[in-house]
UniProtKB/Swiss-Prot annotation:
Species of provenance: Elusimicrobium minutum (strain Pei191)
Entry protein name: Large ribosomal subunit protein bL20
PROSITE patterns: RIBOSOMAL_L20
GO cellular component: ribonucleoprotein complex; ribosome
Protein's job: Binds directly to 23S ribosomal RNA and is necessary for the in vitro assembly process of the 50S ribosomal subunit. It is not involved in the protein synthesizing functions of that subunit.
Gene name in the database record: rplT
Length: 118
């Protein structure tokens, strides 16, 4: 009798079980459970990559807000003042500037305050 797909099937099983090799219990040993868990893990990895972008933006905004409040302003007024001043720095750069170069960041806050006062 001819054996169909034996090499391909074995390779496919081996690939799934290799990916599942740190999972708890039967999820790392039984093919059906391992396949289900690997699929679920790939879904979580995909959504995690998307969610990471939102989390970083939230972190940057929190850092900017904390630094701006030390200067007597809040985040939304600061961003509004920068927009009125035609200063286009993204939130990542503003966050880094607030941490690494507080003097330059203070100058930006002063520019934003002047733009709001007008």
């Amino acid at each position: 009798m001819r054996i169909k797909f034996s090499v391909a099937r074995h390779a496919r099983k081996k690939k799934v079980l290799k990916r599942a090799s740190g999972y708890y219990g039967d999820k790392s040993r039984r093919l059906r459970m391992a396949t289900q868990q690997v699929d679920k893990s790939l879904v979580h990895a995909y959504t995690g990559r998307k969610d990471k972008k939102h989390q970083y933006r939230q972190l940057w905004i929190t850092r900017i807000n904390a630094a701006v409040r030390e200067e007597g302003l809040n985040y939304s007024n600061f961003i509004n003042g920068l927009a009125k001043s035609n200063i286009t720095l993204n939130r990542k750069m503003l966050s880094e500037m607030a941490i690494q170069d507080p003097l330059s960041f203070k100058k930006l806050v002063d520019v934003a305050k002047q733009a709001i006062a007008k």
